[in-house]
Design a protein with these regions (language model features):
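Non-catalytic helical/linker scaffolds that mediate oligomerization, partner binding
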Residues: 1-229
């Protein structure tokens, strides 16, 4: 690593080749040194146990609509009351929630059944503004919040809000789902969008945790882990 030039770009395929070569060299050294003691896996055992897998095929499905337009939100709320249909309404807020107009805030405040969606938040001032925005709502501790930011999830969970962890929390296996359950106690989760349906069906879902999955979702460039690499 010390011999690499500063600013050198290495493609993902080349990184994989280097990894494979490193594994081959390590395996060769182990064969050449019979006295080498392999690690005893029992020394690193854990008391964590996965919950029994609950088949996602037997669950009752519910519909949810994700929108980010004030007029559509108002229309959807009126339609829901008119037809008396049971579905969730999720409203995606901008990262800079301080620009939210009073008219929209009042509508969200008057309809506590609307789930608020906070996308990934990178700046500290945006994070603090999001926390303050939620706390200004009437009976905010009873709100359901969908968020892709674990810091925001942690702060709002302390206030009593029901938390749904979004796809950017990168829930990709049963173990990190269990860790999130222990640390943040979410009411529901959306697995990583990198997982296909067959992988999601194999997840061990903890008790009192709803499994959400988007049928359609807007994805952005440079968002996945592969793009970031």
């Amino acid at each position: 690593i010390e011999k690499l030039d500063p600013g050198l770009f290495i493609s993902l395929s080349e990184l994989n080749n280097l990894r494979r070569k490193a594994v081959e060299l390590l395996e060769q050294k182990i064969k050449e040194n019979p006295s080498h003691k392999q690690m005893d896996e029992t020394d690193y055992s854990t008391e964590l146990k996965l919950p029994q897998n609950k088949s996602t095929k037997t669950h009752n499905s519910k519909e949810a609509y994700l929108i980010d337009d004030y007029k559509k939100l108002n229309q959807l709320l009126l339609e829901k009351k008119t037809i008396n249909k049971d579905y969730k309404i999720i409203y995606e807020l901008p990262s800079a929630v301080n620009i939210v107009e009073k008219e929209l805030f009042d509508l969200l405040n008057q309809n506590p059944e609307v789930t608020l969606y906070f996308n990934s938040i990178l700046m500290q001032n945006d994070l603090e503004a999001s926390i303050n925005f939620v706390k200004k709502l009437t009976d905010f501790s009873e709100r359901e919040i969908l968020c892709d930011n674990t810091g925001l999830a942690f702060e709002l969970k302390k206030s009593g809000c029901r938390i749904i962890l979004g796809p950017n929390c990168n829930i990709h296996n049963s173990w990190n789902l269990l860790e999130y359950k222990e640390s943040l106690e979410p009411s529901g989760v959306i697995p990583s969008l990198e997982l296909d349906l067959s992988s999601i069906e194999k997840l061990s879902i903890p008790e009192n945790v709803e499994l959400w999955y988007p049928k359609k979702i807007r994805t952005m460039l440079m968002q996945s882990r592969q793009c970031l690499v």
